[in-house]
Design a protein with these regions (language model features):
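N-terminal interaction/assembly modules
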Residues: 1-123, 127-141
Length: 141
């Protein structure tokens, strides 16, 4: 390694699990099946965190969608890009149910997924909606 170079960033298993969960949520919506059913159809059993995220989003989907709809000013859920909506569901689930994950990490991870897999404006959109949802789903104690 040259002087001044940094070692390559090691992959983060939690980031990978979020990405796999996004794939499964997207697949479920595209096929018109539950996310839990999409999990069951996998040939290779997903890791524990992916399962936790997918089952959590599936179990709380109505509540998550209601919260997202309330904060996504000017956007109906039906009008949102499917990937954005599923990234928002993942982020909203983590804000509401995974108190061990810092708010900044939840939002940053969701923004990165949106930037990577959706439209040019998706990162800003996801950031804005999740930032607004923080007050609803993870009030200061």
């Amino acid at each position: 390694m040259e002087e001044g170079e940094h070692p390559p960033k090691r992959p983060d298993r939690r980031s990978d699990a979020r990405e796999r969960a996004l794939y499964l949520l997207y697949e479920a919506q595209a096929k018109g099946i539950s996310a839990t059913d999409a999990l069951e159809l996998q040939i290779v059993e997903p890791d524990e965190m992916t399962v936790l995220l997918v089952r959590g989003v599936d179990a709380h989907r109505a509540r998550l969608d209601e919260a997202i709809a309330a904060r996504a000013t000017g956007w109906s859920l039906e009008r949102m890009p499917v990937l954005d909506l599923n990234v928002l569901r993942l982020g909203a689930f983590e804000l509401a149910e995974r108190q061990d994950v810092p708010v900044a990490v939840v939002i940053d991870e969701a923004v990165e997924l949106a930037k990577r897999f959706s439209t040019d404006n998706s990162g800003r959109f996801v950031n804005g909606v999740l930032s607004a949802l923080t007050a609803d789903l993870r009030p200061a104690t």
